[in-house]
């Protein structure tokens, strides 16, 4: 979605609503495309006393295997998108403002970039996920196993001293 910003920059108090669905199927995380259904983007672009801001909420369903136990998990994410828009930056790079020199905002690209930044680096089924047994591969969230953890060869000498 392209938003023409010229009238917004030139009209104090103007508020343009944004409400649409965006495909995020191209978002890739660890070789997977976890967002298959379209994301819902709802918000507005507003000129308030000459300060133009984009404020929106992005909502989507994230479906991927847990990084510890590999169980498929489906979770709904909602996060805010907030940017102050300027036609030109006065001094080099400034992360507080989003420069739109041609007064056109490609909202799809911006939301996709923000989604990539907002996604967790590790995706877990729950905070207390125990993962898989490194010996037999059982899901430790569902069952216990009798496997003995392999001993680090560097610590084996200390273990022998403790046994004596």
Question: Where are these predicted regions, by residue range?
Answer:
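Structured interface patches
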Residues: 1-164
